[in-house]
Amino acid sequence: MYNYLDFEKPVADLEGKILELKKLSESGEAVDVAEEISRLERRSKDALRDVYRALTPWQKAQVARHPDRPHCMDYVRALFTDFTPLAGDRAYGEDEAVVAGFARFKGQSIAIVGQEKGNDTHSRLKHNFGMARPEGYRKAVRIMDLADRFGIPVVSLVDTAGAYPGIGAEERGQAEAIARSTSKCLSLKVPNISVIIGEGGSGGAIAIATANLVYMLEHSIYSVISPEGAASILWHDSTRAKDAATNMKITAQDLLQLKVIDGIIPEPVGGAHRASDVVIRTTGETIENGFRELAEKVGDFREQRREKFLAIGRSL
């Protein structure tokens, strides 16, 4: 059974009936329900398509946060081989909210930096729900330094509600760590590609998402603050998150129109969590094509990246 979101109730009702009929059929009772199951499955597919065809920005935010959505390590395990993670920032400690290391992708060496949320209570606590501390961003800088030194392209997989706002993180220089990571992304001499696979929250996301090419999954979000946070600031009422999401231009479609991102990776009907293997494969193909495009069209990766982000600033 899926974890249904509140706006998926029509689909949940139909799929619940299908499950009941399948159990009845498997029980051995002399009842032919195959035709009814087939009819309900068609209705369910149509209902799911109708729901996802008309998602609001707030509903997309809910899909982006879905607990069953594939996370960073799901992509790493499926797309890359010989992944060797590196740990620690060589200054304070290790932050498991950030996954970083080297691997092989389509026969080539690649550096990977990503944010991992975890998929159950234990792993979510271990990875701090994907909210990185300063050590995580300094680890990312360490990996990008090595990649730059050895001429290895960088892939970043972004999925965070934002950098961790705890007192300890602030005491250890959270803002400086984010700024340094962003600066490192901008100064890389090698090509880098970033994919927003779920949430792209504030500076916590942009610290590893400042890339030559930035892609978003179809139902991911990317914003300077969460809808709840914006609603709390603007109206002193976090329950108005729906209104905030509508006005913030947080969806992939809005950001492509604003030229903040370079492309949208399609998701299966119902979201990435309904067919993880499909969306992961499509993401891999997009990354491969992106690096090929950069190799063919860009001579100076650092200059192209600089001009890209300056152009965003001029146009907004």
Swiss-Prot record:
EC number(s) recorded for this UniProt protein: 2.1.3.15
Top-level taxon of origin: Bacteria
Catalyses which reaction(s): N(6)-carboxybiotinyl-L-lysyl-[protein] + acetyl-CoA = N(6)-biotinyl-L-lysyl-[protein] + malonyl-CoA
GO MF term set: acetyl-CoA carboxylase activity; ATP binding; carboxyl- or carbamoyltransferase activity
Pathways involved: Lipid metabolism; malonyl-CoA biosynthesis; malonyl-CoA from acetyl-CoA: step 1/1
GO-annotated biological processes: fatty acid biosynthetic process; malonyl-CoA biosynthetic process
Keyword Transferase applies: yes
InterPro entries linked: Acetyl_CoA_COase_a_su, ClpP/crotonase-like_dom_sf, COA_CT_C
Annotated localization: Cytoplasm
Catalytic class of the enzyme: transferase
Domain CoA carboxyltransferase C-terminal: 40-293
GO cellular component term, pick one: acetyl-CoA carboxylase complex
Pfam families recorded: ACCA
Keywords assigned: ATP-binding, Cytoplasm, Fatty acid biosynthesis, Fatty acid metabolism, Lipid biosynthesis, Lipid metabolism, Nucleotide-binding, Transferase
HAMAP family attached to this UniProt entry: AcetylCoA_CT_alpha
Complex and partners: Acetyl-CoA carboxylase is a heterohexamer composed of biotin carboxyl carrier protein (AccB), biotin carboxylase (AccC) and two subunits each of ACCase subunit alpha (AccA) and ACCase subunit beta (AccD).
NCBIfam families named in the record: accA (TIGR00513), AccA_sub (NF041504), PRK05724.1 (NF004344)
Family: Belongs to the AccA family.
Function: Component of the acetyl coenzyme A carboxylase (ACC) complex. First, biotin carboxylase catalyzes the carboxylation of biotin on its carrier protein (BCCP) and then the CO(2) group is transferred by the carboxyltransferase to acetyl-CoA to form malonyl-CoA.
Official protein name in the record: Acetyl-coenzyme A carboxylase carboxyl transferase subunit alpha
Organism name: Chelativorans sp. (strain BNC1)
